[in-house]
């Protein structure tokens, strides 16, 4: 009898323990109790560019004399007077101040990716950029060298014509059949562009550099 009673008590204790365990609510994960941190607002790169352009416009007009010293670091690639000898690097002589200063701004912001130019532009202030632009704008650009090589590409519609001749046709009149607009509309008949930040001078520029940018 005692054995049966002991077994009954033991069985009841097990049932009570299981019932209590089932009744206890599951512990909520700690992560669920903590609210997720709000996501950082996305940065608008165009807003940064616009702000930088506004700051550039507020700087004083470029001082060519002050820019001469500041442009010394540019000489290794672009030449002392802005007439680079290597077609890998553009000629800056005679280029518009507004165009040069705006491009330096884009390099500094990384909006125009170029690791080399980023290193040079990173420490420049808007006034530095305008001064450098003014210096190169006062320099005389050297004439470029025309490529008179005939086009050999069998698939080219200009096969057999000289590169310089085809280039002049496209620059002055475009090619309506291929939806190519004339370059003169923005850069002018002589390639001098429009003073300001948007339409650079192309006259005398290295053909290789121009082709790479296009």
Predicted segments, located by residue:
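The feature marks the first
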Residues: 49-114, 211
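Cleaved targeting-peptide boundary
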Residues: 20-30
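Sequence context surrounding c-type heme c attachment/ligation sites in exported
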Residues: 68-72, 97, 101, 172-184, ...
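Axial heme c-ligation environment in periplasmic c-type cytochrome domains
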Residues: 85-91, 107-152, 195-201
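Electrostatic cytochrome c docking/interface patches
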Residues: 29-71, 85-86, 146-177
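Sec-dependent N-terminal signal peptides
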Residues: 5-13
